[in-house]
């Protein structure tokens, strides 16, 4: 129904995305290029993401904290690879209070440096380990080609930072975060199948010895990096003197990790599940799981809407009533664009027969149900929708991943999907050849799809594609 409102995906996918963000009341451009205003509906989706991920993070033993937005430039200069990697994106404050600062201040692009400084202060003994921290914050990375949610100069995220006594412990925890927090959230809440793997050296986080990633396929066949976990080895510990006294009384360097997911997941949600009618939100994520719409603004109809909504709330569902202004058709279109999983239509004719209509957003199917069973039916349908959305996305991922023999074939296949080939067929020369066509190696995997320990393992395959 919303096809006349939104640009069709097949006609212009970027324009379709912009239409959904604007007409779905998700976000707007801020007054400074690259900044973003997240509107209430977009914020409610991010809040749900925060809540689901935060609960999983806390289950690992990590604790939330907060560190400063302003970081001395000298902190970044201590880790050469880190500052080199972030230098083009840094926003730097040189004046404050009407005077030039003695030392420039970086507006936080990520917090490894400042958190490393305090880890060195707080960690004295092996008894202080592991130190497991997480913060929810904004970060600034100056973006030349901004796009709402996907690339903005300021965005929101969570970033976790940990310190451990051994490489084995640091690796195990970073892997735990990647599988039990990110992958679990992506599959079971966002209904997002991804390829889990590690980044090649050319794509690693600046200063990391290994970067794990979860790569999702959007409706246009491009990749979106959904979340990353980084093993930092002892690079940052060495730069910031993060030592601990071992049980034997020796001073030893810690091993650290960092990991993060951001509001670009909201963009991923739009492009992964959306259709020509707008956003489609998985029920477990949806801030509004069902909307009850009055076909006419009549007292009997409005009373019935209240009863239906009350039954949904009693069933533990998140529900909204739309008595609404404007035509019934216009209101239906607005809710379709927002992607609410279920719509209950309450009209005077149906009420005479004691029934209402229940409509699925994901496939448009409609049921006519008596008022006394609609809430329980909705509960069952919401789980079915969650299951169906994941399986549909999983099928698209499989159907549009093409096994190829060499870089030339990968270049062709990556025009509208992913290509998978032997990593030995790529190497540095192959990566350079792919980049000429705006294609990158998204991740490396073992042949069984599992994550390797590092990129030097034998017999690895790589996933390559264009990306956001």
Description of each model-found segment:
Residues 1-468:
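NTP/phosphate- and nucleic-acid-binding module
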């Amino acid at each position: 129904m919303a096809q006349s409102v939104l640009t069709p995906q097949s006609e212009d996918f970027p324009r379709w995305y912009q239409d959904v963000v604007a007409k779905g009341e998700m976000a707007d451009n801020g007054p400074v290029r690259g900044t973003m205003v997240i509107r209430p509906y977009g914020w409610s989706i991010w809040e749900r993401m925060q809540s689901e991920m935060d609960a999983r993070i806390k289950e690992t033993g990590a604790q939330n904290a907060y560190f400063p937005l302003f970081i001395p430039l000298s902190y970044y200069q201590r880790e050469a690879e880190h500052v080199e990697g972030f230098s083009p994106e840094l926003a730097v404050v040189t004046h404050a209070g009407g005077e030039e600062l003695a030392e420039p201040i970086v507006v936080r692009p990520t917090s490894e440096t400042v958190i490393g400084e305090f880890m060195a202060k707080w960690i004295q003994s092996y008894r202080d380990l592991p130190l497991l921290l997480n913060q929810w914050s904004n970060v600034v990375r100056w973006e030349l080609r901004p796009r709402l949610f996907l690339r903005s100069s300021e965005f929101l995220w969570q970033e976790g930072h940990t310190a451990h006594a051994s490489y084995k412990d640091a690796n195990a925890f970073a892997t735990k975060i990647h599988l039990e927090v990110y992958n679990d959230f992506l599959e079971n809440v966002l209904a997002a199948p991804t390829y889990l793997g590690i980044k090649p050296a050319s794509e690693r986080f600046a200063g990391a010895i290994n970067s794990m990633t979860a790569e999702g396929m959007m409706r246009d066949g491009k990749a979106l990096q959904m979340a990353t976990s980084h093993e930092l080895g002892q690079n940052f510990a060495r730069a910031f003197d993060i030592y601990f006294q071992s049980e034997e009384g020796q001073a030893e360097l810690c091993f650290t990790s960092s990991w993060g997911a951001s509001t670009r997941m909201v963009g991923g949600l739009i492009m992964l599940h959306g259709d020509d009618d707008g956003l489609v939100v998985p029920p477990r994520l949806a801030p509004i799981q069902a909307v009850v719409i009055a076909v006419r603004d009549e007292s009997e109809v409005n009373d019935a809407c209240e009863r239906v909504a009350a039954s949904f709330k009693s069933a533990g569902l998140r529900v909204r009533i739309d008595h609404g202004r404007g035509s019934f058709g216009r209101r239906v279109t607005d809710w379709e664009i927002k992607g609410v999983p279920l719509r209950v239509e309450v009209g005077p004719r149906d009420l005479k027969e004691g029934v209402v209509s229940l409509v699925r957003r994901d496939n448009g199917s409609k049921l006519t149900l008596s008022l006394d069973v609609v809430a329980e039916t909705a509960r069952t349908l919401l789980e079915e929708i969650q299951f169906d959305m994941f399986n549909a996305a999983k099928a698209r991922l499989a159907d549009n991943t093409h096994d190829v023999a060499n870089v030339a074939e990968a270049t062709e296949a990556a025009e509208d999907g992913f290509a998978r080939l032997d990593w030995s067929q790529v190497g540095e020369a192959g990566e350079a050849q792919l980049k000429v066509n705006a294609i990158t190696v998204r991740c490396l995997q073992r042949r069984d799809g599992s994550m390797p320990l590092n990129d030097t393992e034998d017999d690895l395959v790589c996933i390559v594609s264009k990306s956001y």
